[in-house]
């Protein structure tokens, strides 16, 4: 890094040296910084670092050094000094931040690409659908497939229960088609199945059949009727072969003869007949389990195919589409449950009569969930044994139960469950209660195919009281069976578990494949009561086959009389029933259905919240069963084992990838309900229903509702429509959620909710296995008192998950719809969703999830004993807000693709930039580079600490002749000769000599160290707010050894103007006069102590306000930093270095292995290098000797000029002037505004320091006012050189009072061309009388015959004459012009007190290379006496002839050194030749 801004300050003293002059020089190469340059700069077109970039860079630079015949010595960094370690740590932190940004950028890139792919797929689908529709329309005109459609369609809305399932004529057609199905037509069907993008090989709608016929070009109209029959059979056969592993639930019946035939031969396929009626469940139950499984799978697939056909017809009607999706989804869920039960029956796994299943653990470990009670268990069991024996005898063994998966007991305090023993008996054969081999009560609900088990002996105390209360209300219900009854109230529950309430979170796993059976804990639940339900299991199967959902209501007819309490110990699942004969009754009894959810160990108790109008009817029972300590310990042990198993499952599933299908996830987590609202049922009116639908559940047409969605539509006896919300718990574990349990099962959607108000939630079967993952949070947004966090995940579409903190109101009520605060929350959520779906502001985000959570940390939930509720909706498509189209048009898609492409380009650029910053140098890179140096025969040294310090020591010990580095710290360590930019593709190299810096800038090593402490370097952070200009001024104003300490004291001292000191006004006056002195005259050098104090006071006054913005570190000024620069740790060995010869064969091998270069390419680089390296001597061109004098920059800042001139004391001021005159110059034609001249005159008069010298000048000038104004105008223009091509501005990071003082360093690329002007020039008299001539020329300012000829750029006037005297020094007038440093014009009249002395060093370093001729003439006049100058000026005015005076001057000055030439330089000859030609 070096010292900030130091290179810019040193640029004016730098020279461009021909690279040929480096021959045979021993150069110390600081190679440590090379490594960083190579790994950051050498990149391929993709932004990745070039392989072995460090070796390639070293190889090329070594070749150039050898080609120049230098003798390089490479120096590498060693250990990092303690002071520098801080900076290294900061840089490492920046790299780590860059790496973090790289990961985020990579995620954005991936998301961008996935979105792009998705958009292209959508565009392609739109195009294909249009083409397909056109083809279908054309084929329909030629092909009649009505019979095929009628035969292949499975009716789902058929209300006639008594319709026959099959007919003899249909069986004959199927039998005939099955024979034909083995022919070549099967290949056509296979090809169609293969081409299906969804992997579904079912083509049942007429359009698809028409496409099949069209693709079979060999078919003709004559065979059309026969082909239809063949397709009907072959489709069924092919479908069953390809999808036997897919779960389905339907019912079908075929003749028993065919059953036996298929069962005996497993290789044959079961051909499903075409059905016009429903299936007889008795026939289905009599079949073997394997055959039931096959038939159900076939039925499910056919139903899915028919659904797709229906979707196409209603795809443009969102309401109908959603209703169709809901109906289809509910049927497929029921089918899947039946398949799961059949699968378990076929497996036959049981231990001791108890069904076993594997939970999240090892593959060969299974758990049997049971509990053993001490003491009262036998007594309690015997009390119920006699009563349940009778029910067990009545149990039918033809049911197909489905076990509840993933049920968990309470951790410490289970909520009690009380069941009704004395309730009115409505015997139903479908509900059976029995005792298994272990003496456990079990209940079977054959309607649902659900078997729920749980130990309830501990709850018998509460049952008696609850039964008496519930029996009255249960007697009123003749149509429904209450699936849950008589649960404890909240008061009793709180008595039971005052400390902690954990979650019983159940979820029925969604298994689309029969090959992957679910693994779960089976929990048995007893029930000895029943209600009126459907007559028999046949009716249930009829409803399933007909497509109608089955409803088992858990409420009474009138919600006002609802007194059934409940508790969260168990989760129940209900499926709506489509009862064809009594739909109106079912409508009045629709209610909330609760579903099992995933196990959540660390969550609070799962509460189900209802609001009822008669909450006071809740049963008040203080009887609580006492739980023994042994039971609690056993439960805790079991809970721990389950938790470990779940953690293992989470680890295994953490790498699972989300499917392509998207889902919309809405999780609403609410605080625990209050006592008043515990058993309340919240029914929302019609108006609130619309608002709820608009805000939460408006989904696109192809959506899928989650199993965690607990929203259902309820209707009361009065016909009032409402929405009842039910909440479970959001899983606390971070594992993936398979959220497909649906409690929103509607018996007749159209009969309950109008299409306009329908819940637009539907499903696609391919979406059912979507895994919901929560990924890293990226941002948060706060509104109100709630926090919203948004997270992005690298999937096909973006998922946004928001967390909103919701708090209970003052009364503890957690009613969602009645709480204004939560209404506000939902409105915020809705606005967030709307923004994310806005195509103009955001790309397609079809994965949007909004999760409302009171606390995302499980530990906080346990500590706060919060009971939270989750409302979760998963959908496969986007939200469809009002005004947002369902489908993007092609124009919108193209626009989105264009935006994504632009974003991809910008993100790629950002990633490449971050990758550059993230790369670091390794030790292996250094080792490889050092090995390369050995092959070339080049010595190298590893410094103990800093490579720059070692290079400086080697130069001081005369081990090397110069140092090649780009780090300005080398000057602080004591370097004398530094070469920079040696590897640029130019013929020169920049050189910096410390002697030039000391003489021309007045900056010694100590002063540069002080500036480094002000500006900041590798060892110190510097002072915030101080730039290069202020640093020079500080060093100038505080030149003492302890100047920096005094500077700190001054900055920290109070402002004297605030204290109201008497000298404050005087100080401001001194500021004005002193600043004018320094600004205009700049004569700080050689000043006395009083002058130094005055300069310091001027600095303080000018920077008092600015200093308030300077932030000084606590350790400033640090002696440790100064010591580290003055006494660095280096290798003190002075042993001479030796160089070897490059090994060509080894280099060729290395190039082949590392760079993949062939021998030809290697030789092209190495052979010229070796040839040049072996040369003994070379003949240099003459230009090489003069190129040292080429200056390439000059300062254009008044403030830098002023500070530099006075930075080194009396004698250093002259040397500083040398710096200011360096650089080729030419005078620009410049017009000075009148007010500028007046300002300059005024500044001269106000200057206290310059008054005395100005008076002396006035003695030599007859017309001081006008001529001086003219002279100032002319001199002001001379600050610019002839060629101004490259301008480098020195920016001062600090704020200062001189805002208009721009610091510019002018770089001149071709100074040699400045000497080739072909314009005519007037002769100049080179004599001591030049001052008089100058005065006269100034006096004749406006005369046409004035001696001074004003020229434009590129032309030199007669006052630009060159003085040829050997003993002449540069004039102070030129100093004041700054050699381009823009000094004030008043200083351009030379002082007579300057010494008449010229040094050889000045000529050697190229002093006066581009000095204007008139200024050199002025330098002569300054050495003469004032009286002589006056006499000569009078004589000059009398003669009026300048040519004779020029001749005399040429005669007197035999030895001429032109100001525009170097010491004996070739560039001076054109001027000499022109002068002679003019004579």
Curated annotation (Swiss-Prot):
One Gene Ontology term, aspect cellular component: nucleus
InterPro entries: 5-3_exonuclease_C_sf, HhH2, PIN-like_dom_sf, XPG-I_dom, XPG/Rad2, XPG/Rad2_eukaryotes, XPG_CS, XPG_DNA_repair_N
Residue ranges, annotated region (N-domain): 1-98
Lineage of the organism: Eukaryota, Viridiplantae, Streptophyta, Embryophyta, Tracheophyta
Bias type Acidic residues, positions: 256-266, 1294-1303
Annotated Mg(2+) 2 binding sites: 967, 969, 1018
GO terms assigned for molecular function: DNA endonuclease activity; metal ion binding; single-stranded DNA binding
Annotated family: Belongs to the XPG/RAD2 endonuclease family. XPG subfamily.
Biological process terms in GO annotation: non-photoreactive DNA repair; nucleotide-excision repair; response to heat
Protein name: DNA repair protein UVH3
Functional summary from the UniProt entry: Putative single-stranded DNA endonuclease involved in nucleotide excision repair (NER) of UV- and oxidative damaged DNA. May make the 3'-incision step in NER. Seems to play a role in senescence program.
EC id: 3.1.-.-
Native species: Arabidopsis thaliana
Cofactor(s) required for function per UniProt: Mg(2+)
Biased composition (Basic and acidic residues): 128-138, 384-393, 411-425, 854-866, 1215-1225, 1233-1247, 1427-1437
Residue ranges of the region described as Disordered: 128-150, 239-266, 384-425, 548-579, 854-877, 1206-1372, 1418-1479
Localization: Nucleus
């Amino acid at each position: 890094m070096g010292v900030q801004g130091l290179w810019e300050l040193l640029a004016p003293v730098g020279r461009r040296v021909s690279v040929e002059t480096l021959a045979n020089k021993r150069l110390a190469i600081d190679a440590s910084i090379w490594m960083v340059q190579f790994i950051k700069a050498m990149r391929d077109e993709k932004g990745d670092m070039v392989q072995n970039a460090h070796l390639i860079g070293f190889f090329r630079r070594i070749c150039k050094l050898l080609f120049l015949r230098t003798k390089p010595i490479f120096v590498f960094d060693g250990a990092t000094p303690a002071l520098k370690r801080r900076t290294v740590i900061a840089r490492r932190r920046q790299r780590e931040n860059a790496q973090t940004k790289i990961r985020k950028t990579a995620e954005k890139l991936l998301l961008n690409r996935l979105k792009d792919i998705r958009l292209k797929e959508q565009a392609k689908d739109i195009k294909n659908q249009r083409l397909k529709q056109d083809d279908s329309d054309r084929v329909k005109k030629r092909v009649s497939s009505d019979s095929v459609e009628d035969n292949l369609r499975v009716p789902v809305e058929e209300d006639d229960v008594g319709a026959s399932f099959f007919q003899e004529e249909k069986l004959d057609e199927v039998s005939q088609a099955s024979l034909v199905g083995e022919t070549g037509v099967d290949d056509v069907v296979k090809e169609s199945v293969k081409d299906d993008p969804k992997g579904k090989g079912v083509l049942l709608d007429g359009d698809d059949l028409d496409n099949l016929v069209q693709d079979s070009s060999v078919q003709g109209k004559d065979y059309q009727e026969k082909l239809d029959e063949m397709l009907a059979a072959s489709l069924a056969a092919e479908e069953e072969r390809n999808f036997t592993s897919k779960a389905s639930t339907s019912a079908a019946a075929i003749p028993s003869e065919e059953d036996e035939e298929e069962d005996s031969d497993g290789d044959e396929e079961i051909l499903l007949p075409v059905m016009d009626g429903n299936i007889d469940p008795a026939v289905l139950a009599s079949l073997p389990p394997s055959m039931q499984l096959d038939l159900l799978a076939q039925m499910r697939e056919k139903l899915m195919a028919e659904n797709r056909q229906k979707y196409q017809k209603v795809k443009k009607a969102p309401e109908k589409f959603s209703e169709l999706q809901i109906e289809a989804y509910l049927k497929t869920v029921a089918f899947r449950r039946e398949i799961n039960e059949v699968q378990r029956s076929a497996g036959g796994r049981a231990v001791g009569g108890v069904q076993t299943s594997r939970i999240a653990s090892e593959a060969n470990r299974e758990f049997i969930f049971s509990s053993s009670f001490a003491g009262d268990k036998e007594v309690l069991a015997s009390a119920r044994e006699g009563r349940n024996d009778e029910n067990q005898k009545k149990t039918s063994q033809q049911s197909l139960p489905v076990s509840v998966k993933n049920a968990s007991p309470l951790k410490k305090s289970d909520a009690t469950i009380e069941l009704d023993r004395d309730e009115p008996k409505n015997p139903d054969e479908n509900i059976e209660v029995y005792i298994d081999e272990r003496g456990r009560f079990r209940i079977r609900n054959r309607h649902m195919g659900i078997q729920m088990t749980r130990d309830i002996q501990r709850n018998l105390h509460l049952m008696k009281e609850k039964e008496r209360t519930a029996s009255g209300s249960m007697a009123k219900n003749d149509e429904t069976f209450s699936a849950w009854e008589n649960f404890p109230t909240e008061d009793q529950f709180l008595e039971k578990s005052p400390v902690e309430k954990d979650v019983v979170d159940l979820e029925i796993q969604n298994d689309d494949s029969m090959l992957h059976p679910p693994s779960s804990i089976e929990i048995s639940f007893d029930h000895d009561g029943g209600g009126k339900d459907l007559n028999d299991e046949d009716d249930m199967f009829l409803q399933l086959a007909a497509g109608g959902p089955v409803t088992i209501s858990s409420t009474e007819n009138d919600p006002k009389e609802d007194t059934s309490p409940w508790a969260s110990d168990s989760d129940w699942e209900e499926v709506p029933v489509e009862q064809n004969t009594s739909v109106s009754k079912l409508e009045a009894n629709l209610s909330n259905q609760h579903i099992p959810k995933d196990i959540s160990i660390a969550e609070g108790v799962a509460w189900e919240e209802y609001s009822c109008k008669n909450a006071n009817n809740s049963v008040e029972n203080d009887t609580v069963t006492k739980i023994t300590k042994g039971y609690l310990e056993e439960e805790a042990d079991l809970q721990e084992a389950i938790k470990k198993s779940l953690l293992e499952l989470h680890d295994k599933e953490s790498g699972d990838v989300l499917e392509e299908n998207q889902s919309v996830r809405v999780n609403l987590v609410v605080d625990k309900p209050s006592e008043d609202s515990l058993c309340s049922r919240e029914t929302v009116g019609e108006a609130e229903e619309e608002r709820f639908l608009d805000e939460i559940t408006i989904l696109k047409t192809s959506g899928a509702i989650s199993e965690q969605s607990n929203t259902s539509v309820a209707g009361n006896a009065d016909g009032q429509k409402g929405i009842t919300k039910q909440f479970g718990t959001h899983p606390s574990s971070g594992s993936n959620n398979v959220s497909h349990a649906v409690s929103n099962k509607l018996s007749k959607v159209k009969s309950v909710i109008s299409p306009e108000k329908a819940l637009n939630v539907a499903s696609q079967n391919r979406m059912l296995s979507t895994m919901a993952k929560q990924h890293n949070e990226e941002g948060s947004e706060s509104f109100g008192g709630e926090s919203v966090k948004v997270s992005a995940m690298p999937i096909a579409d973006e998922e946004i998950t928001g967390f909103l903190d919701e708090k209970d109101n003052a009364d503890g009520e957690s009613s969602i719809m009645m709480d204004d605060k939560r209404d506000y929350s939902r409105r915020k959520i809705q606005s967030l969703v709307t923004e994310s779906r806005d195509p103009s502001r955001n790309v397609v985000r079809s994965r949007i999830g909004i999760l409302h959570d009171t606390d995302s940390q499980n530990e906080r939930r346990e500590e706060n004993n919060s009971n939270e509720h989750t409302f979760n909706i998963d959908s496969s498509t986007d939200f469809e807000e009002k005004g947002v189209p369902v489908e993007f048009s092609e124009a919108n898609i193209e626009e989105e693709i264009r935006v994504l492409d632009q974003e991809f380009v910008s993100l790629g650029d950002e990633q490449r930039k971050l990758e550059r910053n993230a790369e670091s140098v390794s030790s292996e890179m250094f080792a490889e580079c050092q090995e390369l140096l050995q092959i070339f025969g080049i010595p190298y040294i590893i410094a103990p600490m800093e490579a720059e310090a070692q290079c400086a020591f080697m130069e001081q010990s005369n081990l090397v002749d110069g140092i090649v580095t780009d780090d300005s710290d080398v000057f602080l360590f004591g370097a004398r000769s530094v070469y920079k930019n040696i590897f640029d593709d130019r013929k020169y190299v920049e050189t910096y000599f410390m002697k030039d810096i000391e003489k021309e800038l007045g900056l010694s090593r100590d002063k540069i160290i002080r500036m480094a402490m002000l500006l900041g370097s590798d060892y110190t952070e510097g002072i915030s707010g101080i730039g290069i200009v202020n640093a020079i001024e500080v060093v100038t104003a505080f030149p003492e050894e302890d100047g920096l300490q005094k500077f700190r004291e001054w900055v920290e001292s109070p402002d004297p103007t605030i204290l109201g000191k008497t000298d404050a006004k005087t100080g401001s006056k001194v500021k004005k006069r002193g600043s004018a002195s320094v600004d205009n005259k700049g004569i700080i050098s050689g000043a006395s102590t009083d002058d130094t104090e005055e300069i310091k006071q001027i600095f303080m006054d000018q920077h008092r306000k600015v200093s308030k913005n300077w932030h000084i570190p606590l350790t400033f000024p640090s002696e440790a930093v100064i010591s580290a620069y003055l006494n660095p740790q280096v290798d003190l060995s002075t042993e001479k270095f030796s160089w070897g010869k490059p090994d060509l064969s080894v280099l060729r091998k290395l190039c082949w292995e590392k760079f993949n270069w062939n021998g030809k390419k290697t030789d092209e680089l190495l052979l010229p290098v070796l040839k040049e390296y072996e040369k003994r001597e070379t003949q240099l061109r003459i230009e090489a000797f003069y190129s040292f004098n080429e200056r390439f920059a000059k300062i254009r800042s008044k403030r830098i000029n002023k500070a530099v001139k006075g930075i080194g004391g009396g004698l250093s001021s002259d040397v500083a002037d040398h710096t200011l005159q360096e650089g080729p110059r030419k005078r620009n034609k410049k017009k000075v505004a009148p007010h500028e001249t007046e300002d300059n005159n005024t500044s001269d008069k106000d200057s206290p320091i310059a008054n005395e010298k100005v008076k002396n000048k006035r003695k030599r000038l007859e017309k001081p006012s006008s001529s001086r104004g003219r002279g100032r105008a002319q001199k002001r223009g001379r600050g610019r050189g002839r060629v101004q091509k490259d301008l480098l501005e020195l920016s001062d990071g600090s704020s200062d009072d001189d805002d208009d003082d721009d610091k510019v360093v002018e770089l001149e690329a071709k100074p040699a061309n400045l000497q080739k002007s072909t314009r005519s020039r007037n002769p100049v008299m080179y004599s001591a009388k030049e001052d008089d001539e100058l005065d006269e020329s100034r006096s004749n300012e406006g005369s046409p015959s004035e001696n001074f000829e004003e020229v434009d750029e590129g032309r030199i006037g007669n006052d630009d004459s060159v003085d040829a005297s050997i003993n002449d020094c540069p004039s102070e007038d030129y100093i004041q012009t700054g050699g381009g440093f823009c000094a004030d014009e008043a200083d351009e009249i030379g002082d007579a007190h300057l010494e008449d002395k010229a040094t050889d060093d000045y000529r050697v370093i190229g002093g006066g290379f581009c000095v204007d001729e008139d200024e050199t003439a002025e330098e002569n006049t300054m050495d003469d006496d004032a009286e002589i100058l006056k006499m000569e000026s009078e004589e000059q005015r009398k003669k009026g002839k300048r040519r004779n005076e020029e001749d005399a001057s040429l005669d007197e000055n035999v030895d001429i050194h032109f100001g525009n030439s170097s010491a004996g330089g070739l560039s001076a000859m054109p001027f000499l030749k022109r002068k002679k030609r003019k004579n």
